[in-house]
Amino acid sequence: MIDFSLMIDYLRGRSSKGYELFGAHFVWENNQSQVCFAVYAPQAKVVSLIGDFNVWNPWPMQRLDCGVWVLTSPDPQPGDRYKYRITTAGGEIWDRADPFAFFTELRPNTASVIQRLDGYHWQDGAFLSTRQKNFNRPLNIYELHAGSWRMKDGDGSERFLQYDELADQLIPYIRQMGYTHIELLPLTEYPLDASWGYQVSGYFSATSRYGSPHQLMALIDRCHQAGIGVILDFVPTHFVPDYYALARFDGSCLYEPDNPNLRDSPWGTVLFDFTKPHVLSFLRSALDFWITVYHFDGIRYDAVSNLIYQGGSKDKGLNEPGLWFLRSTNFTLQQDHPEVMLIAEDSSDYLKVTAPVVYGGLGFDYKWNLGWMHDTLDYLATPFAERVGMKNRFLFSMSYFYQENYILPLSHDEVVHGKKTILDKLWGSYEQKFAQLRCLYCYMLFHPGKKLSFMGNELAEFMEWSEERQPGWNLLDYPVHRSFHTFLQRLNALYCTCPALWEQDFDSSYFQWLDMGSVFPEIFAIQRRDGSGQELVLLLNLSDRDCPNYPLSAHLPATPSAYRLLLDSQSKQEVDKEPLSSDSISLPGLSCLILQRENS
């Protein structure tokens, strides 16, 4: 039965539980199991249900006063395909997928599939009971595309690992590499593989490319049992223009703007209209759905700048409806799921993105620091002789860092579309690129902020990522790539075991530049501390010239003998961790050293 009070909340833009009202739900009526279908199509002239259970012959649905169409029948069964046949006010007939479908048949087919989500027995209670937003915990995220992380032999969809197969291989690898979380590129259903999931057709449907909803639940459950958090990439801004999905759903612009000048996105998709209350409820419900039903530990919102500014451009003015969506949705999610991370992929300089809504913020917990990423990679792509003039750009990120809670991303966006891979962006010879890659990750480790790196970065790829092939795992057969892979494991392990590198990320009193290139313009020193007094120091030489006598006594807070060497980026072996015995140290070109204060 339809709960009309919940329905009114949904239509007024106040609901985050629309998935409990709409779609196909099993109910017990007249002493038998039946399926209740409900769809919102207020401008439709007629809505009928078609599917396997009626040999695709239309069954007329009943229209309620609020514009919702309903039908209950004992005939539909789990696994049956179905659609809504909508006759518009103008007499056009369109067969539509269910906006609230929990599953969809494998592309290129587009029918919704009746799916029971109950019945999976979660075993992640211990993990959920200690789940936090990780402000004072290590947060080192491995971003991946589920369809291409590993691929099987074969053609088309046969190449994809199913969710359980992915779990078998991915979880041991993540534990081996020392990442704390994985972040999955969008898993909401989408028609085009080449969109990577960013052109969504089903906001409540886990893509059928990789298996069933219960298989996805099992992947997340197994990650949790292994101590690994799982973050979902989510697209709240736009959807596919295909007429089987949301576009002109009931013949009107139900989900998109009525004004055609405001309808199209830069990605060839259709923008949501956040002035329409039911759109707010639709997207808020989708976010709540993935957290509640699938136990995701964080949601990363894609393209937030387009919700802040019209067209994503500051020159076009604020997107007030988009801002209202962000504030109202994040406020609700923070209340309902206070331990789940809300992350903004935002390239704008809009302030208070990670401030609470009650203090005038947008209510996110973290924001990607794309400025740090661009400035750092641009510096390392600059010829050595020209880096002196780039010093201020390299240092710039710390001038604004404490305005937000930042994640430092080396994401999928930076290794596609001719941008080159992280390794290949770096200036210099083959050997110099690898030396700088080690320095980059050490610097990233020491820079305040949580960490994110895309799959393949750990292999030191030279080939850009493509969804059509897996990363170059065979690179690990080559000593230089295997050596970097091992180095990154050591670095990740160091990160997780040293609270100085994550405990006080967002408190400026626990970070200090010890050397901002004051004597040697391409040599820097950073100090990180934690609340117990542990102190780590990074010495970083980003020139191609050796510095045989770097003056430790001029830059370290204590005498050099109080420190021991923890890691050397040029050493393939564990370093001698005896206390330093000299007031100076050799710092080769394109290298870095990590020191630990003995009494810390």
Segments predicted by a language model, with ranges:
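C-terminal accessory region downstream of the catalytic core in glycan-modifying enzymes
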Residues: 471-493, 498, 550-578
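Conserved alpha/beta catalytic core and glycan-binding cleft of carbohydrate-active enzymes
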Residues: 108, 295-297, 312-468, 496, ...
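Substrate-binding/active-site clefts of carbohydrate-active enzymes
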Residues: 105, 127-136, 145-296, 300-318
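The feature marks proteins involved in alpha-glucan
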Residues: 1-36, 63-143, 148-158, 165
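C-terminal beta-strand-rich structural cap/linker in extracellular carbohydrate-active enzymes
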Residues: 78-82, 577-600
